[in-house]
Amino acid sequence: MRVSVVGAGALGSVYAARLASRGACDVEIVSRTARPGRRIHLERVDDGDTLEWSSPAHVDRASQGSDVALICVRYEDLDGVVPRLSDTSAAIVVLTPMMPPDRDRFARALGRPVIAGMPSVLAYENSAGAIRYWLPRVATTWIERVSPPGPGADFVQRLTRSGIGARLDFDVLARNAATTVSFVPLSMALDVGGSVDAVLTDSALLSLALEAAAEGRELGRVLGKAEAWASTLLRFAGPLALRLGVGVVRSRSPEIIGYVEKHFGRKLHAQNVVMAERIVELATERGTRRAALTKLLARLRR
């Protein structure tokens, strides 16, 4: 199986490296500009496994012979991917979070169907240039089951062979959207506050974030069924529970706090703003509460 991984960031690098080295896939990397490949060092945080992978030269368009084009770009960059897929007939699998209108717009721009996916990998590149990542046991990479089936089942088998648990399901877009809108308010608050501790010590911001998260969950229930772990975690989230939870995580795995601050904070400010705007629009369209989401968005835009 030939897989074109579109997006050369940490997430795309983990999927590409594991599919190539352990999933028996021929992998190419598609980025904004063609450039030489490089040697990538990957470190799995949760079990200490390391992987050295020499990525091929990057290309600026997915190849005609690819079976799957795996989209791993930021939310605000999704529309810009369209020209990079103009030469391929591959099945388009999108791991980037999408709301239902996003998938419709993206499919229209491509002129063909788009398959929703949901990643299970957490990854970042550290200051030494290594890709550090987690494969949480409770998470699954979901790939939408479509008809006709195409290469989906084979792709899921390759992911599983690579060590990334994966499954097919029909409601992946709804599941992803419901989970995303539930968590984005907390990302918005982290972006506003600048750090986990800043959010936890700012009572007004924390209260606003939790109310916005409640509105996000309400919207999520309209869109679909969020991942079970997400629903359970957010249902019991409160100021005391969050402070205690952060304390436990920091004592056991301080690196995850740094990852959250880097990945969901100011570094992704543009993505946070665009996604927050889309969520407020969806809440307006679906008639769910949005007062706290709107206030938090206003603070995010400052």
Language model: regions and residue ranges:
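Rossmann-like NAD(P)(H) cofactor-binding subdomain of soluble oxidoreductases
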Residues: G48-I131
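A non-catalytic, amphipathic alpha-helix used as a structural packing/dimerization or gating element
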Residues: D154, R158, S207-V222, V274
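Helix-loop-beta segment of a Rossmann-like dinucleotide-binding subdomain
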Residues: A130-W142, G193-T201, E255-R266
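Rossmann-fold dinucleotide-binding core
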Residues: M99-P100, D104-V181
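NAD(P)-dependent Rossmann-like dehydrogenase/reductase catalytic/cofactor-binding core
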Residues: R221-R302
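Hydrophobic anchor at the start of a short beta-strand
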Residues: V3, C25-V27, I92, V114, ...
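Active-site-proximal catalytic alpha-helix in oxidoreductases
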Residues: V172-R217
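NAD(P)+-binding Rossmann beta1-loop-alpha1 motif at the extreme N-terminus of oxidoreductases
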Residues: M1-W53
